[in-house]
Amino acid sequence: MIKSFRDKETKKIYHGYRSLKLDQSMQRVAYRKLKMLNNAYDLKDLLAPPSNRLEKLKGGLEGLHSIRINDQYRICFRWYNQDAYAVEIVDYH
């Protein structure tokens, strides 16, 4: 379950509101993936579909995980006790 958001734009998308951060088609995908993250009981639940490409991040982002929205955008989050914290949509380019 999502417990906190790192930014207000990601929270808006999760609650079904329009954001200027992403175009409309990208927001639909982000919304679907955020709902998937919210429903995940275990990190392994995010392994499907394979297009999520669940990753444990390294370096300066150690402690974070991500799933892909597309090649450019990812949803990054901290996973602790079966919950997601500091959820945010990040532009990787």
Language model regions located:
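Generic structural signal for well-ordered secondary structure
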Residues: 3, 27-30, 46-50, 70
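Basic, amphipathic alpha-helical segments enriched in Lys/Arg and hydrophobic/aromatic residues
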Residues: 35-37, 41
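Enriched for short, Lys/Arg-rich terminal
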Residues: 55-58, 64-93
